[in-house]
Amino acid sequence: RLLDQRLVDAVVLDIRHCDGNALDLPARFPRIPMYALSALRPEDGTLLASCRKAGFTGILVEGVDNAVAGEWIAARTAQVARRAALADAPRLLRLTDRLQLAAWDEVLRRVGVPTKTGHVAQALRVTREHLSREFGAGGAPNLKRVIDLARAACAADLLGNPGYTVRGVVRILGYASPSHLAGAARRVAGATPLELRELGPRGVLTRFLRGRTRSRV
């Protein structure tokens, strides 16, 4: 249920209290790391083998991995993978100034919620006008378009999961309607929402760099 309501970066399942449908989750959501939690009792052996076969990212041993599990999972989330796919975006977008880079990081941090220039400016404690002017300096895209880019890249990543529909992604990312996501996908990548599924985050960035970096249309 949570996967259908909000942006989820990783899932930990206590396999002793899950029904058989839990084993289907890695196949339905391959871009979201899934971890099985177990006390490693002898009777859990068959179930653990089933988890590995189903595609779970890892097995966490209750009482043994507790101290390091949070840090270990945090380094291997869907968000980390999305950021890695866009790691060279600042260079490709000509974002070199400290304010530009801080704004880019804030845009990525807010990628799961509707974001306007004013939200980013408030987080960085500058005026909206100053941020808009400085962000687009040196040939960089305008900030509104970059916000569209980051959110469309996130939508593309989510749509890479067979368990998500376009309407489901619209709900999770807070788009007003499927047509609003379609408009963003068209502006950023010249693609339909369904085509985002094939592009992935990196493909969206590549399309964006082909002449779609300036003002909204």
Label each residue range with its predicted role.
Residues A89-P114, A123, R145-Y164:
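A short, Lys/Arg-enriched amphipathic alpha-helix from helix-turn-helix/homeodomain DNA-binding modules
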Residues I73-A89:
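The C-terminal output helix
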Residues G183-V217:
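…primarily DNA-binding HTH/wHTH and HhH modules…
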Residues T46, G63-I73, H130:
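C-terminal output helix
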Residues V11, R31-G45:
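A short, hydrophobic beta-strand element within the central beta-sheet of small alpha/beta folds
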Residues T117-V146, V170-T192:
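Basic/polar phosphate-binding segments, predominantly the helix-turn-helix DNA-binding elements
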Residues R41-G58:
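Alpha4 helix (beta4-alpha4-beta5 surface) of REC/receiver domains from two-component response regulators
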Residues R1-A10, H17-C18:
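Acidic, metal-coordinating helix/loop segments flanking the phosphotransfer/catalytic sites
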